[in-house]
């Protein structure tokens, strides 16, 4: 029984009378009118295939008592189903129990909380909700690559281990081969010159800086890989390990950046609506009732643009109390972002040109001397989902911004050096892949959209 067909293909239109082999796991089983019914799922789609096992099978008595979670291989004939809700079923001619499952199997037929399912992350992909989440995640990852490939962007693999902190926040996970119980010392401090890389190294927080270097050779590039933040945060929106999508474009300014971000985000919204319809309908029914309407609205809308200063004025005039203060020079909080996108604009909006004091050193200083060419894309329900900027291409101003931010220019000499020869205006943005999945599925905790979440004090599996 080697030639198998995926259940998705059978349900999509395999003609009645066709002999097929399916392999999967029993979701439910029941006995009625002298036959056993097994609902078998192979992960290829949300729906299970009903297998009808009749008493003539050699192991019929075994199948009558088969447990939820058992793995089976089934040979049978596709037949039109008399039951409501399914077009076809499989009349088994042979069923092999590949791997049994007793009543101790944790995913019995009942509703489990997401909190409980996190404790059995090795099994939760077998549930309906997480099967849908990870099918959508896979499809979106493929869509990301397709979007950029169609537009001629080069895919760049940036390093996981780095000696630089792109955001300057000091949230690196350290990588060392030194003996923690007896590290070499020099002048009262750990002597990292004796470490593997002869310097302090850590896991990357972003591939942006290296991506910029490649944009100065290939014009349009993107990175898509894991990033790490040693941030001791236990919110539903933060994880220590997550994936980032970071395009960079040479010969581009902030408006070019916003245009790419809008095209990209709308493309991904349309992709899940068109290619993940069954799973999206499941999320709309069981996770977030307004999901489909919201994603459809974003996919079909044009995004607004608003100056940071104008956004502050809107917030000051708001007839609702905010938990966090609103003043020019303060960063926007989620409550402010949601008010702007939901109440002021009624759809997605780019907020642009932020005070330089609250943004990163690499963002291009505007001519007013107070703001930088930064942008955040705000969307209903979640607030900020994309952050980007035009990068500072002028050597002297970049060096000055680094010193102002307490970053030693010599520590990023190569980044500065790229501005010496053939420097061009360039821009890019970052989109957290998990936050994208949360937005497009309605899942409210980042731990539930990544296979094995890494958060403070949790690194199991």
UniProtKB/Swiss-Prot annotation:
**Record-linked Gene3D superfamilies:** Bira Bifunctional Protein, Domain 2 (3.30.930.10), Nucleic acid-binding proteins (2.40.50.140)
User: Has the keyword Signal been applied to this entry?
Assistant: no
Gene Ontology molecular-function annotations? asparagine-tRNA ligase activity; ATP binding; nucleic acid binding
Catalysed transformations (reactions): tRNA(Asn) + L-asparagine + ATP = L-asparaginyl-tRNA(Asn) + AMP + diphosphate + H(+)
GO CC terms, sorted: cytoplasm
* InterPro entries linked: Aa-tRNA-synt_II, aa-tRNA-synth_II, aa-tRNA-synth_II/BPL/LPL, Asn-tRNA-ligase, Asp/Asn-tRNA-synth_IIb, NA-bd_OB-fold, NA-bd_OB_tRNA
Keywords noted in UniProt: Aminoacyl-tRNA synthetase, ATP-binding, Cytoplasm, Ligase, Nucleotide-binding, Protein biosynthesis
Q: Establish whether keyword Phosphoprotein is in the entry.
A: no
Q: Where in the cell is it found?
A: Cytoplasm
Principal location listed in the UniProt entry:
cytoplasm
Q: Name one GO biological process term.
A: asparaginyl-tRNA aminoacylation
Give the enzyme's EC designation.
6.1.1.22
The annotated subunit structure for this chain is: Homodimer.
Which HAMAP family does this entry report, sorted A to Z? Answer: Asn_tRNA_synth
Q: Which family does it belong to?
A: Belongs to the class-II aminoacyl-tRNA synthetase family.
The identity of this protein, by name, is Asparagine--tRNA ligase
